[in-house]
From Swiss-Prot:
A motif (RCR-2) lies at residues 115-117. GO terms for molecular function: ATP binding; ATP hydrolysis activity; DNA binding; endonuclease activity; helicase activity; metal ion binding. Residues 723-738 have a biased composition (Polar residues). The lineage of its organism: Viruses, Monodnaviria, Shotokuvirae, Cossaviricota, Quintoviricetes. Residues 639-652 have a biased composition (Acidic residues). Residues 11-271 form the PV NS1-Nuc domain. Multifunctional protein which displays endonuclease and helicase activities required for initiating and directing viral DNA replication. Also plays a role in viral packaging and transactivation of several promoters. Binds site-specifically to 2-3 approximate tandem copies within the origins of replication (Ori), unwinds this hairpin region and nicks one DNA strand thereby initiating the rolling circle replication (RCR). Becomes covalently attached to the 5' end of the nick and provides a 3'OH for priming DNA synthesis. Keywords: ATP-binding, Coiled coil, Covalent protein-DNA linkage, DNA replication, DNA-binding, Endonuclease, Helicase, Host nucleus, Hydrolase, Magnesium, Metal-binding, Multifunctional enzyme, Nuclease, Nucleotide-binding, Transcription, Transcription regulation, Viral DNA replication. It comes from Human bocavirus 3 (HBoV3). This is Initiator protein NS1. Its cofactor is Mg(2+).
Amino acid sequence: MAFNPPVIRAFSSPAFTYVFKFPYPSWKEKEWLLHALLAHGTEQAMIQLRNCVPHPDEDIIRDDLLLSLEDRHFGAILCKAVYMATTTFMSQKQRNMFPRCDIIVQSELGETNLHCHIIVGGEGLSKRNAKTSCPQLYGLILGELIQRCKTLLATRPFEPEEAEIYHALKRAEREAWGGVTSGNLQILQYRDRRGDLHAQQVDALRFFKNYLLPKNRCITSYSRPDVCTSPENWFVLAEKTYCHTLVNGLPLPEHYRKHYHATLDNEVLPGPQTMAFGGRGPWEHLPEVGDQRLAASSVSTTYKPNKKEKLMLNLLDKCSELNLLVYEDLVANCPELLLMLEGQPGGARLIEQVLGMHHINVCSNFTALSYLFHLYPGTTLSSDNKALQLLLIQGYNPLMVGHALCCVLNKQFGKQNTVCFYGPASTGKTNMAKAIVQGIRLYGCVNHLNKGFVFNDCRQRLVVWWEECLMHQDWVEPAKCILGGTECRIDVKHRDSVLLTQTPVIISTNHDIYAVVGGNSVSHVHAAPLKERVIQLNFMKQLPQTFGEITPEEIAALLQWCFNEYECTLTGFKTKWSLDKIPNSFPLGVLCPTHSQDFILHENGYCTDCGGYLAHSADDSVYTDRASDTSKEAIDAGDLGDTDGEDSESEASEVGVRPSKKRRITIPATPPNSPGSSVSTSAFFDNWCAQPRDEDELREYERQASRLQKKRESRERREETPMATSSQESESEPNPTQWGDKLGVIPSGTPDQPPIVLHCFEDLRPSDEDEGEYIGKERL
């Protein structure tokens, strides 16, 4: 005989009711897939149950099937998963592994949705957080369902249609942790006089007795309630059905359901007409209470907030629900509530306190990266992304930079807690930094003008923006702590010093931040420790005026792609990009042979390895005749970076050799018999591992690059004419007279005279006497 759970006689308060909808709309047409995913092994029993006769006819096979499927069908598995997720949800709310709460879960097959009713009560839930906790509970339920689907994956791979349901659950789970439920988890609410919706507390036992219990059983949409429910357990007036019920983790059998309903109706929840006192006075046998005890018991312990406190609580809920961070957001989204609070005594101060509390809540629950994804969920990276374009123009791998930004903003990059964009004006450094901090929104700025309180605006922020950073002796020590992510205390105006926790820092400047200015002296003592805390990106190429601003959505798309593809930790970054140590000067990108950093070639997308734009496919209308006739063997491996299909040799003969652009210098492999060339090439790459910092270094860079280019061209010309060289070597060597002519040794006219040796600035000119001999004659 099945175990009958005891009747629940008290329910923890406050209690709320939720409805979870299975995030797969076409579940009824593919119900057999749910049998395989959630209740593997029950498919045949469900098919046999479809052909059984209804009650009250006798059917032994039907009774055996219902008994074997008591808690093994997919509705029971769904009910158990929801119960386990709700238990985890309450343990997180109470911060206890064994929460003290009451939970009732009932799964039902609706006309359109497969859903579960949840009644939960206990400490940790309140009118303020029950509604905002819906995404958290939704994500936990989907996680439990995914784990149960993986039990089938351990035995065999998914079928294509099963994989479709599995990926739908995974996609819904990612959206849930981003705060999106898509209406699949709802809480019972009421509307106040202003039209706002709030979570509605319920009388759990009455709700369970009047709404959930009086229903008939139906465990599959292929069958009917009169097949799954016996006549003695049939609710006559019930129109809706249920699938499975759990009361505090214990299943409620079908044959015990009417008795449970009668016990709740008669004993636990009696009406006013059933209260009787046996013919005696109601106060006759009560114990006597002393004056002091009566006075103590008559005092109400329930605290009732006043109007000001209610307004503050409502404003705090609005800030959390609508992501309101500054006073301007409050004016734009809830002006009525703001005016009501401004009308209270000290209203402006109260609003600052509410915003401060909301900032503390955001900083404790989010990092800069997670809050950016919370504000911009579902962004996709496209090839026309301006952040991608800017980093390619400046010579960096945008995916590598995005990976580093994810690690820094997620506080997972060790001691290097700062990203510095350095370069001259109009290079995009402020454009990039502004897009990052404005996407996060909760940021603080460093103010050099307020010399006593430089970091006054940096507390309770997700990120710090230091625009035009200048290092001074007065604040270099706290700056080293902040740039390195070390907790320190900072001075705040009109208050005591406050603790500043680890906060990522974004710097955009054209100053040398490693040189500390103090009085009339400049010190470089702090340069080494500052460089260990900063990742510097050198932006040296000026942008056109029509480049435009980078939007926060584009930054969010780049970082979201990197966060999904890479492991955003210090170890993951070093492993992915094969680095032993993260240098102060961020490494330049290395493009794949056929990929480009020019935005003109962005239509084919971007490379997921180097970040460059993919080359265009071959097109006869673009390529010239000569280029189209060129065979694969005639293409030089060093020229694979040029994919525009034009004859590069003819252009070089017309225009001449010019220095190549930054990071696009093509240096061929060094011949084995040329050790000098390999030394110069390796020295060139060692000297220019980072971009030039000023115009002098840029000129030196172009000079050395031009020299290497000329060496490569001369070596190619020598390789192209090997036969001419061999023919010259085969000729006979010159005789001494010929060597003398070449060296400038001229024999004299008389045998006794020594030969005439000509120096580099002399030639053999005839004397004046000799000139007279040739007058009127033709010189031989």
